[in-house]
Amino acid sequence: MSRDLLGLEGKIVMVTGAGRGFGRAIAHGYGRNGATVIAVDPDVELATGVASEVEALGATAIPIRGDMSVVLDVTSTFEKVEELFGLLDGIVHVTTAESKTPFVELLEGEWYDLMSQDVKSSLYVLQQGLRHLAGGGFVTIVLPPAARIEPHTVSVRKAVEGLIEGATRTFPGVRVNGVVPSRDPVGDPYDLPLVRAALGLVSMVSEGIRGVVLEVQLPEPPLEFEPYAALRELP
């Protein structure tokens, strides 16, 4: 996809959870297509590393330390962005909580962590983001992977979908959409289809599309060869 087709050249885009996984890959994708990337992550070293990687691609990038599940962090992050750039053109918020605990073994603390990292963070980003977006801006949320099918993870995903629907109805001038990866991140090039979806949803060719949650099928990486395990099987 060309920069002209996407219409991202010179746009100011904030990517949360940018330090690793899908967030890192998406930050790279926006940088490759000419956007100025604000890399936000709770770990400032990871945010700084990704910003440097984006700059190496020829784009402008700055790191900001921010935990989107903490309302004071969210507020201060958007205030810093406003001081530096004014209004944003777009936001990509990546939910980052993981739970592989069976439903019947789920403890209260883990449940609250899931709600905080995924639902609260999405709510806070939408609340603040909608105040700091330029006209016709966008918010794209990367939801928990579809492979997580335990009741508690499905309920979190549906709650975030509800926020997308509600924001779309309340703010029809903003393109609020979501993407659901089929699995957890494993790295380039296997996560590239999700990056393309996150770029395509906000491109000029997708103008008018809002309130949509797309499921993105990602290829499975090849199994790693474990020579020592193979040798142990020899007689």
Regions found by a protein language model. Give the residues of each.
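Conserved NAD(P)H cofactor-binding loop of Rossmann-fold oxidoreductase domains
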Residues: 94-100
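Substrate-binding pocket helix/loop in short-chain dehydrogenase/reductase
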Residues: 102-103, 110-115
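A short, exposed helix-loop element centered on a Lys and neighboring polar residues
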Residues: 126-127, 165
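Catalytic loop of short-chain dehydrogenase/reductase
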Residues: 138-172, 180-187
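C-terminal helical subdomain
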Residues: 173-174, 178-235
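Conserved glycine-rich Rossmann-like NAD(P)H-binding loop of the short-chain dehydrogenase/reductase
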Residues: 35-49
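Conserved glycine-rich cofactor-binding loop
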Residues: 19-20
